[in-house]
Amino acid sequence: MYAIIKTGGKQVKVEVGQAIYVEKLNVEAGEKVVFDEVILVGGESTKVGAPTVAGATVEGTVEKHGKQKKVVTFQYKPKKHSHRKQGHRQPYTKVMIEAINA
């Protein structure tokens, strides 16, 4: 059984026992998290929501928080001795999926 959930402005396909990386959630490591915005539940029979599947939830446990690899942006203006270098590390949350309730 699998499901497609919406979290952090993105859609993610999940299965039980899978670890996913999502945008940072305001939940401590080790706590349970429930995703209510389930767009599709698949398996023997597929349920498609309009826009979400009524009563369907996905449960998981937060394993850790962290930051992704640095993305470097560099801008310059030729012949003007003007340049700017900037780095960014996006925070994420690692979630282990435990149950899909449909």
From Swiss-Prot:
Assigned keywords, A-Z: Ribonucleoprotein, Ribosomal protein, RNA-binding, rRNA-binding
Keyword check for Ribosomal protein: yes
User: Is DNA-binding one of the keywords?
Assistant: no
InterPro entries xrefs: bL21-like (IPR028909), bL21-like_sf (IPR036164), Ribosomal_bL21 (IPR001787)
GO CC terms of this entry:
cytoplasm; ribonucleoprotein complex; ribosome
**One annotated GO molecular function:** rRNA binding
Transmembrane stretches in the record are none
The GO annotation for biological process reads:
translation
- Subunit text: Part of the 50S ribosomal subunit. Contacts protein L20.
Q: What does this protein do?
A: This protein binds to 23S rRNA in the presence of protein L20.
Q: Which NCBIfam families match?
A: L21
Family, according to the entry, reads as follows: Belongs to the bacterial ribosomal protein bL21 family.
| Name under which the protein is recorded | Large ribosomal subunit protein bL21
Organism (species)? Enterococcus faecalis (strain ATCC 700802 / V583)
